[in-house]
Amino acid sequence: MEKEGVCDTINLSDQMYPDEPFCSEMKTETIASSQKFEGGEGSKVVFSREAPLIGKDSAGTNSGECCGCSAKKLNFKGDDDLVEKENIEQQKKLNRQERIELGRLFQGAVTSLDWELAERLIQLADPQTLNDLLCVGLDSVWFLSTKPEFQGITGLIKKIICHGAHDFTRATLRTSFLASCVSACQSRTMSLSDTVTVMAQRLHERLQECNGDEILKAEAGAKVQKFTEWALKCIGFHSRCQGAKDRVSQNSAAEIELQLSAFKMFLDLAGNHLSGRDFTEAFDAACFPLTLFSNSFDPGWASGMSATVIQGLLGMLVEGGADNVNQCFLEASRFGSTELVRVLLQIAQRNSLDVDVDLALGFASHYCKIGTMKCLVEEGNAIAFLGPLMRAAERGCMQVVQWFVKRGCRDMELCLALTAATSSCQVEVAAYLLPRVPPPVLTALSIEILKAAGERSGGSLQGVEFLLKSDFLGDSTATYSVADSIARSSEDESVPSDLKSFLQEHWSESAFEKGMRESHDDFMNFMRVLKKGESAISLRDLPAPLRVAIAYMPLYRECMKADGRLLSQRLRGQLVEAVRQLQGCAVAVVEVSQTRNLMAVLEHHLTAIFD
């Protein structure tokens, strides 16, 4: 699984958001053109700009106009020209400073529950500012706590729409993001100021895991961070107004019901002015913050009150036409957002949607998200272990390999994982898997294992050498025989040439015979020097143990350096011949099982020098 398997596209505005903690000072809108990083499966989080809000004007309209709007108009089932016609008197364009001031006043009126003042401010707004006020009013939904507050804010939203607000896409996208941040912050024990630091660090880590141009990633990261900081400021502002200081209080079931009812009312008013794409992008925006905060969630967050709001929000977005549940599910799995994975599993189940739990398991295992892997297997019923296990073995990710093995793998899965580790020269993983593959399976597939490991080795046969030295068949005669069989397979084109050459040179019967000849030649050369050497220091004058050490210490060191239970055939041949010479040629050609005994004989002769 490649790194770029899941990578989100993040679209934000170029607008610099003010530092004041007024929720009215930031908005979002969709952008057609986006900055895209390398990636495939991931979802897109689309945010954007628009100028901040708000202003103040002496001009106004009859306050009874909005109250007199019919249900037909509120639900936008009549002619859009009706709304436009009724608001002709409001078409005066407010400048930026006026919009900002009006927005601040409106925000203050909403948080202080001064509905009368808020209604008067609505009448002063121009069309652009009305869209801004719609965002502010809708954002306030997630902080409702009483029935009068519900009636007040829903009444304001209706009036804002009646007066001409029409940017439902931006309002939905923005408030979905904010609602997600509210739910996430309710699960945390640290302060909001600490949350900003945690969020920034997590965002940086997430972008580093994505492929793409570094400059574009930095720009996207800065924009996402600004938007998230705005959301946290908005949460902090409302929390302080509710007397919670720098922390977010938990909502009761009754409060959550009010909040979701208010959002549902807004969706009903928007009607068909929200497209399936709008719901999809809002779903994406709601999931995005949860991946940033996932490492800080309390265990069981997905089944607690903090997650109830986001579950209800996501459910309504799916009902509206969001079709990216699986994409967000895969992304959450990749980033180890276990609690979000749980929420999305529940959403999929309730709405009879298919999510690819096996592919998600592959993503989670690739990035070593053990907690998410456990959730996908136990709660999502993921069963496809083979692919993730083999990829983990190829990468040498011992933690993931051990997790799969402990969960229970079939014999063939273990065998294939061993082959994958061997071909990638992941000796540590291969050593862990080897004793767990049943011997009958290894025996039946021994030739195929070595051939496959050699074929995918990329030029290094360290893994193949490890298997042979480890006596992977548990029978030295059988292990040597398998290696010799492959070395002799001159007509088998499926055997990689480098593997065949390696086995012929080191692990075949001919290699054993060559080793014996080499050792014999070394002995004869040594004897020639001993008897006919013209050096001033004659080897013949040295003590016998020292002469043995000079002749055979290099071979002994080479044998000791060779790790594993078996020596290569070539080295074994040299050892056999050396012992025969030391024993006065009285030793017959030994069985392979006696190789270690021969090492003991050689060691005995060498250590005599210390007696």
Swiss-Prot record:
ANK repeat start-end pairs: 292-322, 323-353, 356-384, 385-414, 416-442, 445-478
Taxonomic superkingdom: Eukaryota
Quaternary structure annotation from Swiss-Prot or TrEMBL: Interacts with SKP1A/ASK1.
Full protein name: Ankyrin repeat protein SKIP35
Any coiled-coil regions, as ranges: none
Annotated source species: Arabidopsis thaliana
Keyword terms, alphabetized: ANK repeat, Repeat
Signal sequence interval, chain numbering: none
